[in-house]
């Protein structure tokens, strides 16, 4: 809740008062089976001063307990236009409609209980679940049962819909609209109003085990406990033959994709790219033989660095991978032990039902759920691990990404308050403007060839950025552009389409008329000033655009991009050592986790895993639809399991397509084409589940090996040790995958005369 709104509320409401947010009249307690003993009252939601959504009170007050003034307030709220009021109230506790004229309905704070049990009140944070019993045959009145966190038994609340003015009014309106159903498509009744109102202030999740039970602000374990175990579909006949197979997910796609490969051998030769001409002279012979293949050129045409990598590093990655294979190869004995312990090759599953259930995907965090995670001062009320668990397994709704991403990208500390974040926001704006002025006000700097080259690279890529998004659809370039962001170029209405790449030389790429692309250019030029050693490299626009679209604020986007680039900088180093190290680690991971597939890739001469270069470079930005990319990135930013979880996601892509590759592909170009064609045809959630299962298996395999080494040392001291190479070895690169810290690798100082990119 914003601080200024808290102050206004504090002036209006004392500590012994609450504001009524919702009431439902003619709700009853049935203390006995006799109708004459029924107790009529009001079921309500109310908020005290400085109360966050989790502190909102659910209460039942009997009519006899209310004064005449309070009774009038309860009646007014009951028959008010609930939908409009709740829309105005749900965001942080604002007390007015857009006009600011709404009167507060202030009443005395409900007591916790009465001597006769005729009332109760409980904060939302104390409610574990609510069982909703709709009116039906045998249950003339619908009712709700509130289950508390500590198991306290509260009276059952019955809804006498035939007496309630608000229910009768709403039912009449629905009948006039010929729509007697509630928002969820079920028959309307009074309890629907209460649950809808509660959903404005709390995360209400329907249990998949018992449909009548709704969990209130559930934690991850609550949802798992109320979800059925998932039974992976695995063919028993393949278990012994395929010991490293995870449960198949989305295989129907891979089967269909094979038809595309029937024409793979009919590729026609194409003219080599100029960049390939330059590197071809020094490329190893095996590379020269594949450098002209269309699928290689397809990747190379997108990123110049991909061509350089292929010519300079691909062969070395193969050689080092082979060396690692010899040095760290696990023998059959340890693999058999691992398989036996993990249940592979027997009648048991690789992972338990509980472990598989924990990997299930959840709904994205909604705005209501997100707001419920903070107290009245804006501080997180759950642990960082808990919120990262929730984001990892569900992601975020788009409406809260603009706030949540600032935490994930370490722009805002997780333990900060709303007031502290406001102060930080102002300091970020000032700091950004100071860095930007270093190039805006320096005519000499802008006249240097290096700066001009960087600017041209940025502008050329900016004009190609996510042209399918309406926010980036460009206008025709016709006039001279400004230097800073104060003054946009003159524009005229024209085709909204961004020019095709083939037309790049037909217009002035520096004349960026789209205001959003213009701001992105300013951000990248300012980042160039901030990180002078790295400079601009092709592919950075792919990383920047999702951030800008989410924040649409120049300074916030800049600092989010700075922090994102801290972990991504190794992808853009001049010597490409960062990409080489990742490809080598992925290679070792495939050997370790999918040994049979790796052996097949050796036969296909594909162990350099070149088809993953683009995927790793820009974190699968070209492999998924826009919304899926946003979901994937926020999940990777959590570092929930590993600071390099993107490598397990890449491993999941291979694992998901292992059968097709092993059974049908036998050449480098076939494998490359097949993997390239997976773009825009993969199921994100299925791959995330598979990646998580692969990581859990990887971690258990490491544990088993470490335990075996410890037992050898314990039982035979002096015989087994690291010096005589008698212990089972795991490479440092694989062990580093267990760390939750992202790998940071910075560019060295730029040598004089060396250009950017």
UniProtKB/Swiss-Prot annotation:
Recite the UniProt keywords alphabetically.
GTPase activation
Compositional bias ranges of the Acidic residues kind: 498-507
Pfam family, any one: RabGAP-TBC
Q: Give any single GO term for biological process.
A: vesicle-mediated transport
Report the domain of life of the source organism: Eukaryota
What GO terms fall under cellular component here?
late endosome
Could you tell me which InterPro entries the record lists for this protein? Rab-GAP-TBC_dom (IPR000195), Rab-GAP_TBC_sf (IPR035969)
Query: Carries keyword Hydrolase?
Result: no
Q: Where is region (Disordered) located?
A: 482-507
Looking at the record, the residues that make up the Rab-GAP TBC domain are 395-640
UniProt entry tagged with the keyword ATP-binding? no
SMART domains linked: TBC
Q: Which GO terms describe its molecular function?
A: GTPase activator activity
* Main function: Most effectively accelerate the intrinsic GTPase activity of YPT7. It is also active, but to a lesser extent, on YPT31, YPT32 and YPT1. YPT6 and SEC4.
* Matching PANTHER family: SMALL G PROTEIN SIGNALING MODULATOR 2-RELATED (PTHR22957:SF502), TBC1 DOMAIN FAMILY MEMBER GTPASE-ACTIVATING PROTEIN (PTHR22957)
Q: What is this protein called?
A: GTPase-activating protein GYP7
């Amino acid at each position: 809740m914003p601080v200024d709104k808290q102050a206004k509320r504090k002036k209006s409401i004392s500590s012994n008062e609450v504001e009524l947010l919702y009431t439902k009249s003619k709700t009853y307690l049935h203390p006995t089976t006799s109708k004459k003993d029924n107790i009529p009252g009001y079921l309500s939601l109310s908020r005290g001063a400085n109360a966050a959504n989790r502190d909102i009170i659910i209460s039942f007050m009997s009519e006899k307990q209310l004064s005449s003034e309070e009774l009038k307030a309860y009646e007014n709220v009951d028959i008010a236009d609930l939908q409009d009021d709740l829309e105005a109230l749900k965001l942080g506790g604002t007390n007015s409609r857009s006009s600011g004229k709404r009167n507060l309905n202030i009443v005395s704070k409900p007591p916790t209980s009465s001597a006769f049990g005729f009332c109760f009140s409980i904060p939302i944070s104390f409610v574990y679940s609510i069982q909703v019993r709709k009116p039906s045959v045998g249950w003339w009145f619908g009712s709700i049962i509130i289950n508390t966190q500590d198991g306290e038994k509260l009276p059952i609340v019955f809804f006498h819909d035939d007496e309630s003015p608000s229910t009768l009014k709403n039912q009449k309106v629905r009948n006039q609209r010929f729509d007697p159903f509630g928002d969820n498509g079920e028959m309307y009744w009074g309890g629907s109003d209460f649950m809808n109102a509660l959903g404005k202030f709390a995360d209400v999740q329907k249990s998949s085990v018992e449909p009548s039970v709704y969990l209130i602000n559930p934690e991850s374990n609550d949802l798992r406990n109320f979800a059925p175990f998932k039974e992976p579909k695995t063919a028993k006949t393949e278990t012994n033959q395929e010991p490293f197979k995870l449960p198949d997910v989305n295989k129907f796609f891979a089967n269909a994709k094979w038809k595309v490969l029937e024409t793979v051998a009919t590729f026609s030769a194409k003219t080599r790219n100029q960049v390939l001409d330059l590197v071809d002279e020094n490329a190893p012979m095996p590379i020269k033989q594949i450098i002209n293949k269309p699928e290689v050129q397809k990747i190379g045409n997108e990123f110049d660095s991909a061509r350089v990598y292929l010519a300079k590093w691909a062969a070395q990655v193969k050689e080092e991978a082979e060396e690692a294979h010899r040095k760290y190869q696990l023998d059959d004995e340890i693999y058999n032990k691992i398989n036996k312990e993990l249940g592979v090759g027997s009648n048991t599953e690789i992972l338990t039902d509980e472990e598989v259930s924990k990997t299930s995907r959840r709904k994205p965090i909604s705005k209501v759920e997100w707001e419920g995670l903070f107290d009245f001062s804006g501080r997180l009320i759950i642990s960082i691990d808990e919120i990262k668990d929730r984001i990892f397994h569900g992601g975020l709704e788009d409406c809260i990404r603009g706030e949540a991403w600032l935490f994930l990208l370490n722009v805002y500390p997780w333990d900060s308050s709303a007031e502290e974040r406001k102060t930080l926001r102002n300091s970020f704006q000032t700091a950004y403007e100071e860095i930007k002025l270093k190039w805006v006000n320096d005519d000499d700097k802008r006249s240097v060839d290096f700066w001009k080259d960087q600017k041209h690279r940025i502008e050329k890529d900016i004009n190609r950025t996510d042209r399918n998004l309406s926010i980036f659809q460009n206008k025709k370039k016709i006039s001279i552009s400004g230097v800073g962001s104060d003054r946009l170029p003159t524009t005229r209405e024209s085709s909204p389409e961004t020019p095709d790449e083939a037309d790049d030389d037909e217009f002035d790429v520096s004349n960026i008329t789209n205001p959003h692309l213009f701001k992105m250019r300013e951000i990248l030029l300012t980042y160039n000033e901030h990180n002078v050693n790295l400079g601009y490299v092709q592919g950075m626009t792919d990383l920047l655009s999702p951030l800008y679209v989410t924040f649409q604020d120049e300074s916030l986007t800049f600092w989010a991009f700075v922090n994102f680039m801290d972990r991504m900088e190794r992808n853009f180093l001049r010597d490409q050592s960062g990409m080489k190290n990742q490809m080598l680690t992925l290679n070792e991971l495939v050997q370790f986790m999918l040994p049979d597939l790796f052996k097949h890739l050796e036969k296909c001469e594909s162990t350099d895993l070149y088809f993953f270069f683009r995927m790793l470079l820009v974190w699968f930005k070209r492999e998924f639809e826009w919304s899926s990319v946003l979901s994937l990135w926020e999940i990777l930013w959590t570092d929930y399991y590993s600071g390099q979880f993107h490598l397990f996601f890449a491993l999941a892509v291979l694992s998901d397509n292992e059968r097709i590759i092993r059974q049908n592909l036998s050449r480098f170009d076939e494998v490359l084409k097949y993997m390239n064609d997976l773009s825009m045809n993969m199921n994100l959630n299925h791959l995330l589940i598979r990646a998580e299962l692969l990581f859990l298996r990887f971690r258990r395999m490491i544990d088993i090996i470490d335990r075996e080494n410890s037992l050898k040392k314990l039982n035979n001291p002096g015989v087994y040790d690291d010096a005589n190479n008698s212990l089972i070895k795991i490479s440092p690169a694989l062990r580093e995958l267990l760390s939750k810290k992202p790998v940071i690798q910075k560019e060295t100082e730029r040598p004089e005369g060396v250009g950017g990119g």
